[in-house]
Each structure stands twice: as C-alpha cells, then as structure tokens.
C-alpha cells in the first residue's frame, strides 16, 4: 500500500463537491485539503492570510491613516504575541506602530490589539461601543452584542474620540464634553451613494471610488509590515525612503515576494 497515495485520497474525499481545490490556492504552493483551511480559517494561516490585522485593520485604521497622512511606519514592535508559532497567527497580539512627524503634523503612535481577551485600557467615560448593523459575521453566524466591539480610541492633544469600524462616525468622550461641544462640531457629510453603488459609479466614471489605490495601497503595506512582525516575533526598523527593513536582513528579504507557483507566472509579469 502506497501510504502517501492513501493519505492523499483521504484528503480528496473531504473536499466539498464542486470545489476546485487546486484553483483555490491561486498563487500559493499546494497544500492538501484540510478543514482548518476552509471554509473560514484560511486567514489564520501565514501561508494563506493576514490574520485579524489584515482582516479588520482596513475597517478600523483606514480613516486615521488617510486623514492624518500617516504613510508608512518607521518602526513596528511586538508588545505581546500570545501563543506565537511559525505556522499560524498568535491567539492574541499587541503591536506598536510608530509614524514620524509629517510636515506640521506631530508623530503618531498606534497600538493594535487583537485576539482572545486582549483589550486596551479604556478611558473614563468610554461607555459601551455599539455593534454596527453592516458588520459582516463569520460563516453567517449572528453577531454578539458585547460591551467592547471592534473599534478605535484616538487620543488627541485636548480630546479623546471613540469610533467603531466600517466607516462609523467618531464621537467625543466623555459624553458631557461631547454635549458641550455639540454646536462647534462640523456636520458629517452624507455620502451620495452606498458602498456598492459607489463601486459601480466609479467603474462608469461618475464618482471617484472612496478607497482608490493611492489610499488602500499604502494602508495595506502598513498591515504587511505588521504581519511580518507577528510572523517573526521581532521588532523591525523601516526606512520610509528606501522602503527597506534596516535592522534585520532576513526580514528585509521577506519584502521580496515569493514567486508564484507554476502556471501563475504570467499574471505577475509587469
């Protein structure tokens, strides 16, 4: 009995009907089917996804990154990586991103928390964060309304803001200060179209997409640097001008993309 063939047959019998497991890999090297990869857990593995940071980061840090003109960090440091290993993302992570002064704007430090029971210290008067109705759930499960939902806390010079995810409106805390400043705050402009309409109208040239490449490209690069820190469990120092990691040769080598597997090369020719 060819044990390798027998094992492969077991994997094939698990593949859902109608699923092209080879095509599912796209550029990634082939892995035998495993229900820990599909359906929902693929993002938890370094070979396939970017963990919670790559998944939720774009829905939480997008406005901060865009409107504060953050660009790329000069340093990313792992503060906590619970259950670190070389195969899949930690059970919980705390990362610190440092951005330099940008013109007249001061330096910014972002601390990212994700994972099981890994919460930031909440400021007085925080209250409860509301769960947005437009937040997608995992595998169609019902979202749980809890005190602390995905979101952000922004500490400015004189004010503290809290916000949720997916473009939710920021609010000032504590509530007493928000009420005192209510007549001084600018109106939040209403979007002329929703998320789906904007995409279609942008395709037709009637609107500008709200997340063009010049916005989401650098934002995704920030997340890639964070994921590298999670994977290597090392602080990285990044040269924003040369776009190279200057304190670790192995980490710097990872900036060069792994060649796509055979059959996918033509899609990566410039």
Regions from the language model: what does each represent?
Residues 48-53, 84:
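Glycine-rich "substrate-gating" loop/helix at the edge of Rossmann-like oxidoreductase active sites
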Residues 1-7, 11:
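Single conserved hydrophobic/aromatic residue that forms the stacking wall/gate
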Residues 17-20, 60, 195-196:
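Stable alpha-helical elements in mature extracytoplasmic
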């Amino acid at each position: 009995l060819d044990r390798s063939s027998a094992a492969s047959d077991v994997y094939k019998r698990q593949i859902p009907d109608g699923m092209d497991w080879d095509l599912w890999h796209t550029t990634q090297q082939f892995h035998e089917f495993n229900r820990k990869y599909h359906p929902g857990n693929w993002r938890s593995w370094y070979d396939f996804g970017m963990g919670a940071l790559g998944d939720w980061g774009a829905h939480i840090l997008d406005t901060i990154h865009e409107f504060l003109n953050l660009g790329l960090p000069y340093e990313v440091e792992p503060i906590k990586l619970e259950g670190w290993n070389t195969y899949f993302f930690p059970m919980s992570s705390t990362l610190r991103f440092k951005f330099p002064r940008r013109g007249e704007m001061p330096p910014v430090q972002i601390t990212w928390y994700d994972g099981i029971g890994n919460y930031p210290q909440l400021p007085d008067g925080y209250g409860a964060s509301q769960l947005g109705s437009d937040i997608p759930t995992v595998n169609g499960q019902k979202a749980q309304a809890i005190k602390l939902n995905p979101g952000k806390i922004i500490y400015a010079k004189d004010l503290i803001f809290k916000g949720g995810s997916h473009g939710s409106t920021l609010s000032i805390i504590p509530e007493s200060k928000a009420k005192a400043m209510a007549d001084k705050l600018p109106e939040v402009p209403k979007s002329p179209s929703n998320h789906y309409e904007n995409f279609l109208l942008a395709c037709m040239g009637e609107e500008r997409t709200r997340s063009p490449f010049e916005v989401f490209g650098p934002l995704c690069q920030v997340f890639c640097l964070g994921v590298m820190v999670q994977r290597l469990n090392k602080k990285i120092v990044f040269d924003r001008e040369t776009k190279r990691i200057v304190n670790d040769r192995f980490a710097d080598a990872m900036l060069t993309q792994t060649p796509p597997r055979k059959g996918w090369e033509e899609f990566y020719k410039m």
